Amino acid sequence: MPTPRGCSGPCHFLAPAFVLLLLPALSGSGAVPSMVVREVQESKSPKPGPHTLSPLPPGPTAAQPRGQAQSDAAGLPGAESRNDSIPGAGSEADGLEGKAGEGSQGGSLAVSPSPGDKPMTQRALTVLVVVSAAVLVYFVVRTVRMRRRNRKTRRYGVLDTNIENMELTPLEQDDEDDDNTLFDANHPRR
């Protein structure tokens, strides 16, 4: 069954996928309110009540002060320059880090996006890859279809030429040539 003129095979399936891919971008701007988006936002909001910090795993980081272990793990440049020989310097820094970490969940200072929230550049890259793949599929399908048509034309190539437009003119008679060709088929310009 032939497809309608305005709708090709791969585009018919890729259009809904493209719309689904753009839904998170639209919902972030407030253009598409949905129950799923609201539920996700409610589950991400911090719950009221006391927050407890998880204990440190046993190992080399347990012997170090909490602030130094976190900065060493994060690879912060200020971690090497901290002076632990001054008695009050380490405890003051630890106290400040503890106070700053109380408001955040898990006690971490760095704000990292959750796996569900994709940065805008990653969304743009995903859309670009999907559109490029759709264009690639379109041209591959188009090339395959064109080759099928060309094979049919080549198979009946002799019948396809227009005989009415062909002129048969006699060749000049040369005694030197042993050519047995009597007529030359010339195609006039169309």
Curated annotation (Swiss-Prot):
Membrane-spanning ranges: 124-144
Localisation: Membrane
Alphabetical keyword list: Glycoprotein, Membrane, Signal, Transmembrane, Transmembrane helix
Region span, Disordered: 37-119, 167-190
Positions glycosylated per UniProt: 83
Skewed-composition ranges (Acidic residues): 172-181
Signal peptide: 1-31
Entries under InterPro entries matching the protein: FAM174-like
Broad class of where this protein is predominantly found: membrane
Keyword Glycoprotein tagged: yes
Record topological domains on the Extracellular side: 32-123
Cytoplasmic domain ranges by topology: 145-190
GO cellular component: membrane
Domain of life: Eukaryota
Topological category with respect to the lipid bilayer: Single-pass type I membrane protein
Family to which this protein belongs: Belongs to the FAM174 family.
Name of this chain's protein: Membrane protein FAM174A
Organism: Mus musculus
